[in-house]
């Protein structure tokens, strides 16, 4: 608390008096979760100049669950530069120096979304209400949030634009689409994506030229295989489905890559090769299992071709590992 400048410190103490101790506290900010009608409240050490509706500093932010329609995004941005929203997470935030003025910001933003006010009307209403507030009249829009911050249905996952993209299992309502081939193609796609991410990380490291060349090859070939996997699904009318098992594999890839990132130079190179040997060995075993589960001949052929590439990658990794020991 002592590290906060005077104004943010005052805001933090005011929030503590109303909502209790914050759930998060660092040298740079305090955070409250599920405080009153708000999803989140932030008080930051950083202060930013903001001249609407009159000059002040921004350091206090209130966030609610709220779905902003795409066609209202520009109007909201023009209304108040300190009003922000995240359509993916389904959130809208107001940042100012007073809680009441953040409540006002959110109330008038809701009026814009619902068509009760346009941008300029909301801006003028904001200024008028602040003047009334300064006169001690306690306008309702400064005291009470008119928005029902429902915590359901505000998120927006958007839509894929890459042809043949996998779908999350929860979004597939037609059970006939949830066949073995749909999950198998998703497994192959996730394997490719995991290898692409690992190769991309290797490209950022100072590894020896042989390891770098190997990583670039894997990046290109797994990228091509990913494209072919998605195209196959399109041709066969099978959309890859991200089942919980597929997602577990994706998380496994991230977990293993996270152990490599802190390493540098030769240490990274050796660990990367060891990970490729382990990972490709596991993928071969998975492909053998999926070959027996596949329903269409086209998917079986693709798995066989993928297996050939994975086998080659495994052999090259083993040779590189041996050469680095010599």
Task: Map each language-model feature to its residues.
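Non-cytosolic coordination micro-motifs
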Residues: 1-29, 34-39, 47-173
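Catalytic domains of cell-wall/extracellular-matrix polysaccharide-remodeling enzymes
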Residues: 43
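His/Met- and acidic-residue-enriched segments that coordinate or traffic transition-metal cofactors
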Residues: 170-326
């Amino acid at each position: 608390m002592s590290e906060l400048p005077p104004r943010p410190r005052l805001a933090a103490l005011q929030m503590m008096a109303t909502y209790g101790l914050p759930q998060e506290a660092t040298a740079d900010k305090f955070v409250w979760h599920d405080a009153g009608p708000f999803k989140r409240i932030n008080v930051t050490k950083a202060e930013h100049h903001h001249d609407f509706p009159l000059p002040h500093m921004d350091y206090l932010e209130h966030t609610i669950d709220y779905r902003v329609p795409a066609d209202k995004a520009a109007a909201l941005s023009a209304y108040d530069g300190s009003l922000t929203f995240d359509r993916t997470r389904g959130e809208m935030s107001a940042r100012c120096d007073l809680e009441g003025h953040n409540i006002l910001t959110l109330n008038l933003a809701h009026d814009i979304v619902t068509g009760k006010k346009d941008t300029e009307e909301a801006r003028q209403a904001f200024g008028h209400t602040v003047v009334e507030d300064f006169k001690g009249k306690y306008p309702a829009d400064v005291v009470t949030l008119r928005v029902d911050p429902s915590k359901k249905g505000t998120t927006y996952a958007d839509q894929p634009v890459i042809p043949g993209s996998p779908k999350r299992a929860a979004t597939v309502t037609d059970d006939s689409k949830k066949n073995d081939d749909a999950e198998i193609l998703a497994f192959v796609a996730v394997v490719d994506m995991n290898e692409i991410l690992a190769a991309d990380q290797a490209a950022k490291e100072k590894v020896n030229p042989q390891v770098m060349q190997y990583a670039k090859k894997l990046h290109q070939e797994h990228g091509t295989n990913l494209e072919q996997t998605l195209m196959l699904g399109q041709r066969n009318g099978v959309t890859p489905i991200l089942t919980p098992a597929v997602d577990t594999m994706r998380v496994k890839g991230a977990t293993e890559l996270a152990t490599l990132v802190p390493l540098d130079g030769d240490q990274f190179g050796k660990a990367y090769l060891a990970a490729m040997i382990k990972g490709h060995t596991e993928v071969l075993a998975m492909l053998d299992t999926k070959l027996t589960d596949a329903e269409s001949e086209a998917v079986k052929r693709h798995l066989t071709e993928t297996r050939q590439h994975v086998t080659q990658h495994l052999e090259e990794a083993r040779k590189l590992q041996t050469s680095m020991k010599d």
